[in-house]
């Protein structure tokens, strides 16, 4: 049997980690459409918005889906659709706030890793603003979030400029007495 080195620190046995994976994608509207392009809660000028019933923020939608994979509560396609039908709410910030509220009192967001693929808009200049906005909505430190962006070298519809897709991995810490 292999011995565990004394320098190896085991995690506190009262904390367990849950990992959620989220994805979303939307096609761009025609260039002349006035709907704004919103990603990570930030408006991108000179880029059309997305075909969606909501504001189409694929970053916030992917994060919502990651929360759903941890909490088992349908935010998109469930609660978001209900908010749209009954109150006309299309703001993905509200959907993400509901996702955060779906956590148990014993759960906390530990880390969020985001990857965005698309030919447009140019994301790099806005990544700090996006991280800040996401941190505000999730109530977590800025250094708990990272965003990478890729064009995908034009190999997918997203990389060819037809839309944007986002993947994310959400790590939740849960206090659990055994």
UniProtKB/Swiss-Prot annotation:
InterPro entries: MECDP_synthase, MECDP_synthase_CS, MECDP_synthase_sf. GO terms for biological process: isopentenyl diphosphate biosynthetic process, methylerythritol 4-phosphate pathway; terpenoid biosynthetic process. Signal peptide: none annotated. SUPFAM superfamilies: IpsF-like. Pathway: Isoprenoid biosynthesis; isopentenyl diphosphate biosynthesis via DXP pathway; isopentenyl diphosphate from 1-deoxy-D-xylulose 5-phosphate: step 4/6. It comes from the Bacteria. Its cofactor is a divalent metal cation. Its EC number is 4.6.1.12. Keywords: Isoprene biosynthesis, Lyase, Metal-binding. A divalent metal cation binds at residues 24, 26, 61. Binds 1 divalent metal cation per subunit. GO terms for molecular function: 2-C-methyl-D-erythritol 2,4-cyclodiphosphate synthase activity; metal ion binding. 4-CDP-2-C-methyl-D-erythritol 2-phosphate binds at residues 24-26, 150-153. Gene3D superfamilies: 2-C-methyl-D-erythritol 2,4-cyclodiphosphate synthase (3.30.1330.50). The record marks 53, 151 as: Transition state stabilizer. CDD domains: MECDP_synthase. PANTHER family: 2-C-METHYL-D-ERYTHRITOL 2,4-CYCLODIPHOSPHATE SYNTHASE, CHLOROPLASTIC. Involved in the biosynthesis of isopentenyl diphosphate (IPP) and dimethylallyl diphosphate (DMAPP), two major building blocks of isoprenoid compounds. Catalyzes the conversion of 4-diphosphocytidyl-2-C-methyl-D-erythritol 2-phosphate (CDP-ME2P) to 2-C-methyl-D-erythritol 2,4-cyclodiphosphate (ME-CPP) with a corresponding release of cytidine 5-monophosphate (CMP). Belongs to the IspF family. Homotrimer. This is 2-C-methyl-D-erythritol 2,4-cyclodiphosphate synthase. It comes from Chlamydia trachomatis serovar D (strain ATCC VR-885 / DSM 19411 / UW-3/Cx). The gene is ispF.
């Amino acid at each position: 049997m292999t011995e565990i080195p004394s320098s190896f620190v085991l995690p506190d046995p009262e904390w367990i980690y849950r990992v959620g994976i989220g994805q979303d994608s939307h096609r761009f509207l025609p260039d002349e459409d006035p709907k704004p392009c919103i990603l990570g809660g930030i408006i991108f000028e000179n880029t059309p918005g997305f075909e969606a019933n909501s504001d189409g923020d694929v970053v916030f939608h992917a994060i919502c889906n990651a929360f759903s994979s941890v909490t088992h509560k349908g935010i998109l396609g469930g609660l978001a659709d209900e908010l749209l039908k009954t109150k006309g709410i299309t703001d993905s910030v509200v959907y993400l706030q509901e996702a955060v509220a779906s956590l148990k009192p014993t759960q906390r967001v530990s880390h969020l890793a985001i990857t965005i693929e698309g030919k447009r808009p140019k994301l790099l200049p806005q990544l700090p603003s996006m991280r800040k906005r996401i941190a505000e909505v999730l109530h977590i430190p800025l250094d708990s979030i990272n965003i990478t962006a890729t064009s995908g070298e034009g190999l997918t519809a997203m990389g060819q400029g037809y839309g944007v897709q986002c993947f994310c991995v959400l790590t939740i810490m849960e206090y659990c007495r055994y």
